[in-house]
Regions:
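C-terminal helical subdomain
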Residues: 176, 193-252
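Substrate-binding pocket helix/loop in short-chain dehydrogenase/reductase
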Residues: 86-88, 95-97
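Catalytic loop of short-chain dehydrogenase/reductase
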Residues: 119-120, 124-167, 181
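The beta1-alpha1 cofactor-binding region of Rossmann-like NAD(H)/NADP(H)-dependent oxidoreductases
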Residues: 25, 49-61, 93
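A short, exposed helix-loop element centered on a Lys and neighboring polar residues
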Residues: 111-112, 159
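Conserved glycine-rich Rossmann-like NAD(P)H-binding loop of the short-chain dehydrogenase/reductase
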Residues: 15-29
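Canonical Rossmann dinucleotide-binding motif of NAD(H)/NADP(H)-dependent dehydrogenases/reductases
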Residues: 1-18
Length: 268
């Protein structure tokens, strides 16, 4: 997924990384895979179990990172949860609660911990929150009512944080990341929930707007590392990119990100 992609690209560029996940098994697996991919990163990557909707759990990640590496310079909040592809009435109460707690409360927990931590360090710090699902722009997408609503809330929250930091005149930068639509196992599972009558059209749309983590994350990480602007929104799927793809497909250039993803992972 995106989190793994960010960690890999940061490690390639010499950073020290604390990555998190909800289970020890998942975290340990990710750390082992990263050290196999990047052998010289073995002493620069550690993992920590975290429940993003629990403030104490998020604080423990900060404390763990500082204890291991001395300080934290960048906090990239990529944790989130999505259940999409079905109408609002087909979304369960548990799914609604999880999306709101992970995406909205989780973003607030991350911001509270990171900003307070940066202030204690007395150093420049960068906090990035993740947008998506049409929530940042207000674009209405059928089957994404709760997810996009939660991301709309994150956008408003980020704007408020930015205003507060500008008034504080400190060295803490608040930014947002719009990573586009990345093809992952989770996304493909969500696509299977789309009603059969709309699935073919949804797959066609995914092939137009979708991209691979291996493509988006190097570009995003480079911009995070060189970012010096308050309120920067790092956006992968710009209007220019979208128009370019649409024109290419109009003139016969086939784009099939789903088949490429499946073939790379031996799923076909």
């Amino acid at each position: 997924g995106l989190g793994y992609g960010y960690a890999r690209e940061l490690l390639k560029r010499g950073a020290r990384v604390v990555l998190t996940g909800r289970t020890a098994e998942g975290v340990n697996d990710a750390v082992q895979r990263l050290t196999r991919e990047i052998p010289d990163a073995a002493d620069r990557v550690v993992g920590c179990v975290c429940e993003i909707a629990d403030l104490d759990s998020v604080q423990s990640v900060w404390d763990f990172g500082v204890a291991r590496f001395g300080s934290i310079d960048i906090w990239l909040n990529n944790a989130g949860f999505a259940r999409t592809g079905v109408g609002f009435l087909e979304t369960t109460a548990a799914e609604i609660e999880l999306m709101v707690s992970a995406n909205v409360v989780g973003s607030m927990n991350a911001a509270q911990v990171a900003i307070a931590g940066f202030r204690r360090q007395g150093s420049v710090g960068k906090l990035y929150l993740t947008l998506g699902g049409g929530g940042a722009t207000g674009r209405v997408v059928p089957g994404m009512s709760v997810y996009s609503t939660s991301k709309r809330a994150v956008k408003y929250f980020a704007d408020t944080l930015i205003k507060e930091r500008k008034e504080a005149r400190d060295d803490i930068l608040i930014g947002t990341i719009s990573p586009g639509v990345n093809v992952t196992e989770g996304l493909l599972r969500e696509m299977q929930r789309v009603p059969e009558s709309r699935r073919a059209q949804a797959m066609k749309q995914l092939n137009l707007v979708g991209e691979h983590v291996e493509t988006t994350t190097p570009w995003i990480v480079d911009r995070i590392l060189c970012d010096t602007r308050q309120a920067n929104n790092i956006t992968w799927l710009t209007t220019g990119r979208m128009l370019g793809r649409a024109l290419s497909m109009l003139f016969g250039q086939k784009r099939d990100v789903i088949s490429r993803y499946e073939s790379q992972r031996g799923l076909t």
